[in-house]
Amino acid sequence: MQVGLQCAPLLTGIKVSNLLGVDRQHRDTVIRLFCTTGISCRLLCECSERVTFFLFRREKLEEYLMCPEVMALMKAFGYSGVGLVDILSKVAERYSGYMKCREPFPHEIGLLLGYPVADVAGFIQNGGKDFIYSGYWKVYENLEERLEIFEEYDQAKEQVVRMIAAGADVHKILKFHRTPSRKHQIAV
């Protein structure tokens, strides 16, 4: 149920990636769960009691990272001309440092999660303040469009919860949503 609640938009194919935090005892279970799916699993941080995974659809994430606006902001974060594996290694290092109170929060995670560039940049420029709405992320412009995306995420969560209540597991949910028809897979 926890995977379904935290990752419904990813599982239904309308989001490019998701963070998943679980108790450390479930680490290997999560890895096994996603090893035979179209969703890649990267351990971001392993603390004493919790682990954080970055789950993603590789092709869609690579496509998103090639958008000129995304590339420009990633370059500002110090990622220039590097591939996804290198990006994820560096993000994991920065995120782990943040979780251990050694480094500032790596805002590039917002881009890797498919958040709109304007909202990631707005968050940084405004220090997380002066947003026009707070939902799945803090919104700094295009509120109507973002509300539509949030509504789709809410609907995905409701649908996944219903499927789990009816006995579906992650594999059945992924199979059911194999060909997403949503318009907001990636918000630039």
Enumerate the predicted regions with their spans.
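Short, surface-exposed beta-edge/turn micro-motifs
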Residues: 15-17, 49-51, 106-108
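Long, compositionally biased
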Residues: 136-188
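Hydrophobic/aromatic-rich, well-ordered segments within soluble, folded domains that form packed cores
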Residues: 105-133
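A glycine-rich, hydrophobic loop/mini-helix early in the fold
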Residues: 28-87
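A structured, charge-rich N-terminal accessory region that forms the first stable segment of a protein
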Residues: 1-47
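Internal catalytic-core helix/loop-beta-alpha segment
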Residues: 78-107
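Short capping loops/turns at secondary-structure boundaries
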Residues: 84, 102, 109-117, 139-142, ...
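Short linear loop/turn motifs
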Residues: 48-50, 124-141
